[in-house]
Amino acid sequence: MKNVLSIQSHVIYGHAGNSAAVFPMQRLGINVWPLNTVQLSNHMQYGHWAGSAIDAAKMEQLVDGIAAIGVLKRCDAVLSGFLGSPPQARAAVEIVRTVKAMNPNAWYFCDPAMGQTGGIRPEPGVEEFIVEEVPALADGMSPNHTELQKLAGRRIETVAEAVDACRALIRRGPQIILVKHLHDRNSPADRFNMLAVTETEAWIGQRPLYAFPRHPVGVGDLTSAIFVACRLRGDSVRAAFEHTLAAVHAVVKATYDARRYELELVAAQDEIARPSEWFGAWVTDA
């Protein structure tokens, strides 16, 4: 069974960061080692919250503890999400380097989380660090539209421009770019677009876009987690992309149908493992 070290935020109530990522990856047959960068009562969009960030040095100490008992070499991948400060971002990068030193086959997937995540905004300097330092180390990245623009340093309005930006990013290091949400001026307003790009191939997929009164938090964290889990279990990029598109849709639909604000992960767990509605992905020659 594959193992992933997941470095993200955590909420006690609700689903954001590791609280949105751990269970879906486990449901897909992956062992998850969660390292919480932030521990909060709930995500901040409720307007009231309690909690704090973990010290960057403690992040590295915790991973050193795993290494000391001889299991870090069994880590197959690192997934990083919200990193609240430049020291946390640097610590995450050092952790990735440590994992790769112990297991050269381990890979690193970065969900850049450069904007507001669950009401939390990273400190100044995090965005610049991710843009400048992380691509060279990452094997895959999962920006949303805004984050892709920041990583590419350009405005993106079409699928062709998005593919070109992803390829430019791939030339800096990553092998796979998963665009969690792509705004395309040529797409219907009621569709949600995702994009997966490698050096030689690109696929686009669409699912229904639901009109929530308040959009649930954690959908991006869920998206990255499912994609990573599918890749770890051996799915091709296209198969992982299609499964992610279908499984995330199932969770979002269950949440919408239940008129809930928090993602219905438990209620939709069978759909995460075996989606009943598939949308497919088509090759784009952009």
Swiss-Prot record:
Molecular function (Gene Ontology), one example: pyridoxal kinase activity
UniProt record, GO biological process: pyridoxal 5'-phosphate salvage
InterPro entries: PM/HMP-P_kinase-1, PyrdxlKinase, Pyridoxal_kinase_PdxY, Ribokinase-like
Enzyme class: transferase
EC annotation from Swiss-Prot or TrEMBL: 2.7.1.35
Residues reported to bind substrate: 9, 44-45, 221
Entry protein name: Pyridoxal kinase PdxY
